[in-house]
Swiss-Prot record:
Active site, UniProt feature: 110 (phosphoserine intermediate)
EC number: 5.4.2.2, 5.4.2.8
Chain's gene name: algC
Amino-acid positions noted as binding Mg(2+) in the UniProt annotation, renumbered to this chain: 110, 244, 246, 248
Signal sequence coordinates: none
Protein name: Phosphomannomutase/phosphoglucomutase
Positions of the record's site feature: Interacts with the biphosphorylated intermediate: 423
Subunit structure and binding partners: Monomer.
GO BP term (any one): lipopolysaccharide biosynthetic process
Matches recorded under InterPro entries: A-D-PHexomutase_a/b/a-I, A-D-PHexomutase_a/b/a-I/II/III, A-D-PHexomutase_a/b/a-II, A-D-PHexomutase_a/b/a-III, A-D-PHexomutase_C, A-D-PHexomutase_C_sf, A-D-PHexomutase_CS, Alpha-D-phosphohexomutase_SF
Organism in which the protein naturally occurs: Pseudomonas syringae pv. tomato (strain ATCC BAA-871 / DC3000)
Cofactor(s) it depends on: Mg(2+)
C-alpha cells in the first residue's frame, strides 16, 4: 500500500465534531483523510503510552477503502493494530477492553445517510469528545505526528464477544423475538446470538448492505420501525428488537406492537440493577422523562441527570462509578456485569433475560411504569453559531416562572406537573426541544412559556408549537 504524501492536506473543520469525526465520503472525507486521522490517533495513543490499537468497521460501502487507509496511518505512526474486521461498534469497544491495548477506533457512519462515514475513538480507555477531538485536528495541522513502523494483525473478536454475552445471560423461558438489523452491522451477530440464548428468532434484514435497501437503520425514528411492528403483530412475537446501523443502540417494540421509548426501558433496567446493587448511581441525559428520578430514588438508587452524548455519558460513568446509564437516543450503558460502554446488543440480551423471568408480557410490564404525555423530539433549524447564542440568551434572560432549572446541557425547566427542554444539538445546526406533562393542557401551557421566551431572544424562529 502506498503511503500518501509526507505532509497532510488541509482537512475541513466541519468533520471534527463533538463526539466523533464524521463527514460525507468523497466530499469532506476520503481515503487520504482516513490515513491522516490514523496518523493523529496513533500519535496521540503513543503519547499516552498505548501502542496497541483495535480497529473495526461497519457495513458501509466506503468502509473497506477507508479502513485500509486508517489502519495504514496507525501502522505508520508506530502502532500495533488488531484489525477486527466488519463488526458492530460495541464489539470494537469490547476489543478495546479485552485485547492488549485500550485504544480502539470504529469506522462507522452510525445512523447517518449512506454517503456518510466517520470515526468513534477511544484512546487509552477514554472515549474522546470536544477538545480531545479538536486536538487530533491540531496534530495534523501542525504535523505533530510520530513516524515509525508498527504492525497489523487480523483478530477474530466476534466469537469471544458472542461467548461472553451468552455465558452472562440466563434465560428462564423461551421467547419469540423479531430482530430487525436494518441491513446494518448488527446483522453479523445479533440474530445468531439471540437464538443461542434460547429464543425463537424471526430475522428481518440481517444481510449487511450499505445501501440500506429496506429502511434506514435508525430505530429512533418511528417510520423505521414499521416493518418490525407489523412482523411482531403478524407472528404473535413476545418482543421486537431493532438495531441502528452500527449496533450501539436498540429500539424495542412490545408484543402489542407499541414502541418502548429508551427512557422507559431505562426504568426497567434501573430496577433490575438496583435489586442487586442498592445505592447505585444511575445516569440519564437531560432528554429523559421526569418520572425516572423518583422511580430510581424510591428503589434505593441515586439518580444523576447528565449531558446528552455517548462520549460525555461514558466519561461521567467512569468518574462517578455508576453501574447503569441511558440516553433518550437509545444508547444504554451497563457497567454492572459488563464494561460500561453503550451496547445495543448486550442491552437487548439483558432485556430478554428480565422478560423471561417475568410472568407478565412486555406490554403489561411496561404499562406498570408511570407515564406522561410527551412530544417526540422537536428539531428547529438554526445555524451552528446561533444555536449556542440562543441558549446563552435564554440562560441569562428568560423568565420561566416557578420552576427548577437545569443548565448542564441547554435549559431544562421542570414544573410540578411537567417539563420542557431546549438545547443546542452537538451534531447538527438545530435546537432540540422536548416536552412532557401529566395533562395535554399542562403540556400546552409549558410549550406556550417556551414559545414566548424563545421568540423574545430570537423573533425569527419558526416554531411548530
Amino acid at each position: 500500500m502506498n503511503s500518501p504524501a509526507s505532509v497532510a492536506p488541509i482537512l475541513p473543520d466541519t468533520i471534527f465534531r463533538a463526539y466523533d469525526i464524521r463527514g460525507v465520503v468523497e466530499d469532506t472525507l476520503n481515503a487520504e483523510t482516513a490515513y491522516w486521522i490514523g496518523r493523529a490517533i496513533g500519535s496521540e495513543s503513543l503519547a499516552q503510552n498505548e501502542p496497541n490499537v483495535s480497529v473495526g468497521r461497519d457495513g458501509r460501502l466506503s468502509g473497506p477503502e477507508l479502513v485500509q487507509q486508517l489502519i495504514q496511518g496507525l501502522h505508520d505512526s508506530g502502532c500495533h493494530v488488531s484489525d477486527v474486521g466488519l463488526v458492530p461498534t460495541p464489539a470494537l469497544y469490547y476489543a478495546a477492553n479485552v485485547l492488549a491495548g485500550k485504544t480502539g477506533v470504529m469506522l462507522t457512519g452510525s445512523h447517518n445517510p449512506k454517503d456518510y462515514n466517520g470515526f468513534k475513538i477511544v484512546i487509552a480507555g477514554d472515549t474522546l469528545a470536544n477538545e480531545q477531538i479538536q486536538a487530533l485536528h491540531e496534530r495534523i495541522k501542525t504535523n505533530n505526528l510520530t513516524s515509525q513502523k508498527g504492525s497489523i494483525t487480523q483478530v477474530n473478536i466476534l466469537d469471544r464477544y458472542f461467548k461472553q454475552i451468552k455465558d452472562d445471560i440466563v434465560m428462564a423461558r423461551k421467547l419469540k423475538v423479531v430482530v430487525d438489523c436494518g441491513n446494518g452491522a448488527a446483522g453479523v451477530i445479533a440474530p445468531q446470538l439471540i437464538e443461542a440464548l434460547g429464543c425463537e428468532v424471526i430475522s428481518l434484514f440481517a444481510e449487511v448492505d450499505g445501501n440500506f435497501p429496506n429502511h434506514h437503520p435508525d430505530p429512533g425514528k418511528l417510520e423505521n420501525l414499521q416493518d418490525l411492528i407489523a412482523k411482531v403483530k403478524e407472528t404473535g412475537a413476545d418482543l421486537g428488537l431493532a438495531f441502528d446501523g452500527d449496533g450501539d443502540r436498540v429500539g424495542v417494540v412490545t408484543n402489542a406492537g407499541n414502541v418502548v421509548y429508551p427512557d422507559r426501558l431505562l426504568m426497567l433496567f434501573a430496577l433490575d440493577v438496583l435489586k442487586r446493587n442498592p445505592g447505585a448511581d444511575i445516569i440519564f441525559d437531560v432528554k429523559c422523562t421526569r418520572r425516572l428520578t423518583p422511580l430510581i430514588s424510591e428503589h434505593g438508587g441515586r439518580p444523576v441527570m447528565w449531558k446528552t452524548g455517548h462520549s460525555l455519558i461514558k466519561k461521567e460513568m467512569k468518574k462517578s462509578g455508576a453501574l447503569l446509564a441511558g440516553e433518550m437516543s437509545g444508547h444504554i450503558f451497563f457497567k454492572e456485569r459488563w464494561f460500561g460502554f453503550d451496547d445495543g446488543i448486550y442491552s437487548a440480551a439483558r432485556l430478554l433475560e428480565i422478560l423471561s423471568q417475568e410472568p407478565a408480557n412486555a406490554e403489561d410490564l411496561f404499562e406498570t411504569f408511570p407515564n406522561d404525555i410527551s412530544t417526540p423530539e422537536i428539531n428547529i433549524k438554526v445555524t451552528d453559531v446561533t444555536k449556542f447564542s440562543i441558549i446563552e440568551a435564554l440562560e441569562k434572560d428568560a423568565q420561566w416562572g416557578d420552576a427548577k432549572l437545569t443548565t448542564i446541557d441547554g435549559v431544562r425547566v421542570d414544573y410540578p406537573k411537567g417539563w420542557g427542554l431546549v438545547r443546542a444539538s452537538n451534531t447538527t445546526p438545530v435546537l432540540v426541544l422536548r416536552f412532557e406533562a401529566e395533562t395535554q393542557a399542562e403540556l400546552e401551557r409549558i410549550q406556550g412559556v417556551f414559545h414566548a421566551e424563545l421568540k423574545k431572544v430570537a423573533p425569527d424562529l419558526d416554531l411548530p408549537f
